[in-house]
Curated annotation (Swiss-Prot):
EC code: 1.14.-.-
Signal peptide: none
The Rhodanese domain, residue ranges: 130-225
NCBIfam families, sorted: PRK00142.1-2
Reactions that this protein is recorded to catalyse: uridine(34) in tRNA + AH2 + O2 = 5-hydroxyuridine(34) in tRNA + A + H2O
UniProt family annotation: Belongs to the TrhO family.
Source organism of this protein record: Corynebacterium efficiens (strain DSM 44549 / YS-314 / AJ 12310 / JCM 11189 / NBRC 100395)
Stated name of the protein: tRNA uridine(34) hydroxylase
GO MF: oxidoreductase activity, acting on paired donors, with incorporation or reduction of molecular oxygen
Gene name per UniProt: trhO
InterPro entries linked: Rhodanese-like_dom, Rhodanese-like_dom_sf, Rhodanese_C, TrhO, TRHO_N
Keywords in alphabetical order: Oxidoreductase, tRNA processing
One of the protein's GO biological processes: tRNA modification
Amino acid sequence: MSIGKILLYYAFTPLSDPKAVQLWQRDLCESLNLRGRILISEHGINGTVGGDINDCKAYIRKTREYPGFAKMEFKWSEGGAEDFPKLSVKVRDEIVAFGAPNEIKVDENGIIGGGVHLKPEEVNQLVEERGDEVVFFDGRNAMEAQIGKFRDAVVPDVNTTHDFIKEIESGKYDDLKDKPVVTYCTGGIRCEILSSLMINRGFQEVYQIDGGIVRYGEKFGNQGLWEGSLYVFDKRMHMEFGEDYKRLGHCIHCDTPTNKFEHCVNEDECRQLVLMCPDCYANVETRHCGQDDCVEIAADLAARGVDPLVTQ
């Protein structure tokens, strides 16, 4: 019986020929029937792939044969190839699009000048020692924090990683520059870069969590400082660290607790992801993001008795 798994991984290391790495990775994944998304740049590699567990193990072995990836850590998650529509392997200026390709410097040890790495237990120890002085700083898109975040975290008003530089240069967070700031994100990669960008802009004591939220949640479940669900970028949309998790998200229409993001019914112009409970999503009249144009489209569909989910 085939057992599916998902691999999450990244490595910051100098790549002199990203195009050659792209071709090799594509051929390797195709030969192992893996699907997912891999980004490659001169700074390294960032990937999420899924497939049969034995094929995933073979992928790890083969990928680690490349000298720059020999020590790369792979995180396992539930799922499989079916959680991804296809295989995508691309070369980009950055493996995370902060819009600062020339600011980031890497060597064989990773990003130069990033925040101090903390293991999950060291995060708790820092909070025990420094108390309320410690600030958790969300390194994800603001939307992701709607369903889960570290307790009392600062959540920057950003829609994409491209927004972060403008946000941290805005002056909103200048009062944090002398405080211990723990940046966090899903698997750690965004904070490798964000922590470096913050240090370059005057933040004096910046940390990042080894393995990100995923590793922290694996260690402490719902008994630590993390609250709620974790947004993930595949068909699952979210994951939890046990059954007794706190539900932070609420339906935008009826305020029912939910951790499920759904697309707005306005497929041509919007498709925004918003939190909707099953009942409101099932009703085409409330299957919208709340914007005036989308409300009108949903009302028109309902009046005509048309439900795109039924007619697809």
